[in-house]
Amino acid sequence: MNLLKQIPKVDKVLSWEGVQTLLETHPRPVVMKAVRNVLEVLRAIVLREEGDAGLFTDEAIMKRVNRELDEINSLNLKRLVNGTGVVIHTNLGRSPLPESVRQTLNEIAFGYSNLEFDLATGERGSRYSHVEEILCELTGAEAALVVNNNAAAVLLALSSLAAGREVIVSRGELVEIGGSFRIPDVMRQSGAILREVGATNRTHLQDYSAAVATETGLLLKVHCSNFAVVGFTAEVSAEQLVELGRQHSLPVMADVGSGNLVELSRRLGCNEPTVQEFVSAGVDVITFSGDKLLGGPQAGIIVGRRELLATMKKHPLLRAVRIDKLTLAALEGTLQLYRDERRALQEIPTLRMLALSKEELAETAKRLAARLQKVVPPVVTLALVEGFSQVGGGALPLLQLPTTLISVSVGDKSAQEIEKVMRLSPVPVIGRIFKGAFLLDPRTINEEDISALTAALQGIVP
């Protein structure tokens, strides 16, 4: 405990020449915060009976103050390297945007724009008009509307079309969409009355039909994109639900979630329905995300019948969930690529990464490991192992994409120790641990990441 006496007071540290130099270029409150944080850490070290006298020299404390000041001044939201192989990683920002969107964002962010100004008439315009035409073109729908995320899209649609009335939905489709947000909760918040039908694993058309009453306002289908029920199962198709809706003059709504706009089945060996299929089936209102399989920014997209979307456009809630100009610019830029499907598959990072073959990834991993091995310390060993990538983002939960992983080993360091060092690098590198090994998946690592990845690997050994 005598070491506590060696910890200087804040005022004394502030009087040091090195700190005085910092005060010339940094606000005093910020420097004081850095000093206090460092001294508090030193006190905690002493109380844990760790460390030695070398921690309390003026030079050692000054180094800590400089590091702490850098940390305080750094942005919390920062770029990192996704080496997990999870393409649409919810915690890592989901879909990276296409390179072609970068210039558009720069122009819109740092200047004025015609966000709500009609250049043709010189009068007030609508922000939603910028993407409505292209969304209708790509999906075949009559009308389109965009808000800030898919949960907001569902909330707006139900609030506009079914508040105070029953919404019939299969019990097996009452999904949790992440972050403890559940479809039943969103429905209740909208003012709609939840009417569950069927069983968890099997729901039939008769279940919906028997539940239709004068209180019914809407039939809802939720595409279960973030989980799968296998075995003894049955579900009602969109076409069947639409036919039932027509018989009772009820609108049918589908929450498609993942927002797939291209045929993925032959490329990935999966059966993920497209938004266009729901439109062709006659579904009246369809909602989906912009930052999942679509590969754009976070947004909630609504397409469907013109008169129903007109009702939503007049609802007061729309103002609270409206899309901002930067998201709108990024979304329009991404959607433009879908006019040429081949271009979309090549230039939208999410689609490009998903389409990489096992052979392509094996060659990429081989080249990357050889390239890195030349510049990392000798104690760092890189090896190739076969494995699988995941789609992520609540899409295609059963799909495993074959890949070749790079296993990183460093002397007697554990995988957890390696993971921590990589994660705390100036540009964090996030990998995964499997069977006691720290692994990097080249599927989600691009050329721009290599310098940061190299620096992180070089920093493993002090």
Curated annotation (Swiss-Prot):
| Taxonomic superkingdom | Bacteria
Cofactor(s) required, per the database record: pyridoxal 5'-phosphate
Q: Which Pfam families match?
A: Se-cys_synth_N, SelA
Answer yes or no on keyword Transferase: yes
Coiled coil ranges (UniProt) are none
Please name the GO terms of the biological process aspect recorded for this protein, alphabetically: conversion of seryl-tRNAsec to selenocys-tRNAsec; selenocysteine incorporation
- Keyword Coiled coil present in the record's keywords: the answer is no
Q: Which SUPFAM superfamilies match?
A: PLP-dependent transferases
The entry assigns this protein to a family as follows:
Belongs to the SelA family.
Reaction catalyzed: L-seryl-tRNA(Sec) + selenophosphate + H(+) = L-selenocysteinyl-tRNA(Sec) + phosphate
Pathway assignment reads: Aminoacyl-tRNA biosynthesis; selenocysteinyl-tRNA(Sec) biosynthesis; selenocysteinyl-tRNA(Sec) from L-seryl-tRNA(Sec) (bacterial route): step 1/1
Which HAMAP family does this one have? SelA (MF_00423)
Q: What is this protein called?
A: L-seryl-tRNA(Sec) selenium transferase
**Organism the protein comes from:** Geotalea daltonii (strain DSM 22248 / JCM 15807 / FRC-32)
Q: EC number(s) per UniProt?
A: 2.9.1.1
What are the annotated GO cellular component locations? Answer: cytoplasm
Query: Sorted alphabetically, which keywords does the UniProt record give?
Result: Cytoplasm, Protein biosynthesis, Pyridoxal phosphate, Selenium, Transferase
TM stretches of this protein: none
Task performed by this protein: Converts seryl-tRNA(Sec) to selenocysteinyl-tRNA(Sec) required for selenoprotein biosynthesis.
The record's subcellular locations are: Cytoplasm
PTM annotation (N6-(pyridoxal phosphate)lysine): residues: K292
Q: What gene, per UniProt, encodes this protein?
A: selA
Q: Which GO terms describe its molecular function?
A: L-seryl-tRNA(Sec) selenium transferase activity
The principal localisation class reads cytoplasm
